[in-house]
Amino acid sequence: MDYIIDYKEIVEQAPAEEPARQYYFMDRVRELVEMKKQEGYAAHCMVEVMGCQMSAKDGEKLLGILERCGYTVTEDDRDADVVLFTTCTVRENANMKLYGRVGRLKHQYERRDGMIIGITGCMMQEKDEVEGIRKRYPYVRLVFGTHNVYKLAELLYQTLVTGKRTFEVLEDTKMIVEELPSDRRYRFKGAVNISYGCNNFCTYCIVPYVRGREKSRNATAILRECEQLIADGCLEITLLGQNVNSYGNDIPGSTSFPELLAAVAELPGLRRVRYMTSNPKDLSDELIEVMKTHPNIERHIHLPLQSGSSAILKRMNRHY
């Protein structure tokens, strides 16, 4: 069956504001998926996470969006019509793992009509890697980076309707899109992003270049998400950021990290709070006091010292 869809008109009718724009495209993808199901389209999806806790959180968002679009999650890529990879680029073996996984999907792509293989995450923020994917893996249909994960529905719709490959990688953005669907892996625990990116530029680290400059979320939005998780049965929450200790430094008059941590710990029904990662230069007496006075904050500090040599630390640009 051929579908007559005026893609240009659909885009023109889309709301300009987020997240309304993405929910609009989720509905458009769902309509298309329902039509394809009448022809035997299974509408199964899979997201494979390769990377840190931030990548895992991105994976939950991607799954939530795909389910809202009408897809059903599968753990077997042989059954999947959409396979997405969230990538890491800190370690070289993570890149090699991705190449191997994508290479093994070639035959499935050739056998499964309409299959979409997509890649996102830190690795896709490197231009050379993106160009390598574009040239060596023509069956990879969708590529986007860390700064527009929220746009999955819009980019997926473009790929489905136009039949063309979609590559959209932003160098940076100040935008934080709230209130998107998410599918938690565990019912009893969850993770909440409190900030994105990093301003430290340690000499050995690629994170500021692939995750961008530090952007703190609004404290009210963070607390609202935590409350929703608790209402959904979540007993343990991990607050995530490249450097949680510097939360709020980019927003004049913002809530500090110790203040935010205390507010989260005091939410009724929450048994345990964790956080990661942190930089020793931003560790404060106030944070230690908050941990001391709130017994449900895990007695654990992820504090990567890196070196005991001041000279080496200076060369690392660690600032302590």
Residue spans of the language-model regions?
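Conserved SAM/AdoMet-binding glycine-rich loop
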Residues: 114-119, 128, 231-320
